[in-house]
Curated annotation (Swiss-Prot):
Protein name per its UniProtKB record: Pyrimidine monooxygenase RutA
Organism: Caulobacter vibrioides (strain ATCC 19089 / CIP 103742 / CB 15) (Caulobacter crescentus)
Function, as annotated: The FMN-N(5)-oxide reacts spontaneously with NADH to produce FMN. Requires the flavin reductase RutF to regenerate FMN in vivo.
Family annotation (Pfam families): Bac_luciferase
GO biological process: alkanesulfonate catabolic process; nitrogen utilization; uracil catabolic process
Record gene name: rutA
Length: 354
């Protein structure tokens, strides 16, 4: 099973809490995390893009780096680990993304890929006059299909003459173009999975619940059904947060502390912003992100326990049919990657060290 790290491009990582580690994003922090991940054999590092935060007492995600420029820097200071940047497709034309991808591939040949997001938080785009209107919630995958068609044309052949509703190319050219650039999509609605099965190489989905490592299995089954219609091989990666310590009790105490300190103002903003997109269907990511059960870490699957318990749950994840790997966040990234590499991974049967 492959393992990746979802690096903290925004302040405080993925914990919307006053009692979790508080920190600002920086290149040095993410370099330390990514180089440490590479040292311990992690397969890839991915950064998100976030253009407006949730506010609150912790100013959650009000402070963010930019994904492509950060990953270009990390590409230059690593040698093996794969590097994925995220593009908010409403903000950068596909021809420019293709040229940026070509440039980063020149820095790290064969190691770079792109994560495509349609955009669901209206405030991110309306603040700069780029929000296309409420129809985007229902038409976004049509937009993304055109966007990706142009991007793939340019990445694979260096030329695009695509003519569509949203994009019109006129002998558009990008050279040099990389030999291979993997594409990721994180949509989990039926429409999102259908898009992924048609255009992407990897699907990223949220794990579910606390210490319920296989609860996401239905997403894999839905992706498999979608891929069967397109005849393409699309690999599934699942997002989890790891909160580990020497004992189950110590780890659970940390988790409870973070939950007790939840930043309610920021969580209220998240709920407000997610509501319009959630109307698109109960299987959308935003419906899960804002659910009250564990909004303190955006309701991603959470693994809490001793190093032995985490290793056991990781192996359970690996047994779910269709799972190619996991994408991990940590409450404390520097210590978390260190502990994973030295204390968890060696115990895993699903990794080379196990």
């Amino acid at each position: 099973m492959q393992v990746g790290v979802f690096i903290p491009i925004g302040n405080n990582g993925w914990l919307i809490s006053e009692t979790s580690p508080q920190y600002m994003p920086s290149f040095e922090l993410n370099k330390e995390i990514t180089q440490k991940a590479e040292k311990y054999g992690f397969d890839f590092a991915l950064s998100m893009i976030k253009l407006r935060g949730f506010g609150g007492k912790t100013e959650f995600w009000e402070h963010n780096l930019e994904s492509f420029t950060l990953m270009a820097g990390l590409a230059a200071v690593t040698s093996k680990i794969k590097i994925f940047a995220t593009v908010a497709t409403l903000t950068i034309p596909p021809a420019i993304v293709a040229r940026m991808a070509s440039t980063i591939d020149s820095i790290a040949p064969g190691r770079f890929g792109v994560n495509l997001v349609t955009g669901w938080q209206k405030a991110e785009y309306s603040q700069m006059g780029l929000w296309p209107g409420e129809a985007h919630y229902t038409d976004r995958y049509n937009y993304l299909a055109e966007y990706t068609t142009v991007l793939k044309d340019l990445l694979e052949t260096g030329v695009s003459d695509f003519k569509g509703k949203y994009f019109t190319m006129d002998d558009c050219r990008v050279s040099p173009h990389p030999k291979e650039t993997k594409l990721i999509c994180a949509g989990s609605s039926d429409e999102g999975l259908a898009f992924t099965a048609q255009y992407a190489d990897y699907s990223f989905a949220l794990g579910k619940g606390t210490n319920t490592p296989t609860a996401f299995a239905s997403v894999n089954r839905r992706l498999e059904a979608a891929a069967a219609k397109t005849g393409r091989d699309v690999q599934s990666f699942i997002l989890f947060m790891v909160i580990a310590d020497e004992t189950d009790e110590k780890a659970m105490a940390k988790w409870q502390k973070y939950r007790d300190g939840a930043d309610q103002e920021a969580l209220a903003w998240l709920t407000q912003q997610a509501a319009p997109n959630a109307k698109a269907g109960a299987t959308t990511n935003t419906q899960q992100l804002a659910a009250p059960e564990s909004a303190v870490n955006l309701n991603m699957g959470t693994l809490v326990g001793s190093y032995e318990s985490i290793a056991r749950m990781m192996d359970e994840i690996a047994q779910v049919p269709g799972t190619a790997g996991v994408l991990l966040t940590f409450d404390d990234f520097v210590q978390g990657v260190e502990d994973f590499g030295t204390k968890i991974q060696p115990l895993m049967k699903s990794r080379k060290g196990g």
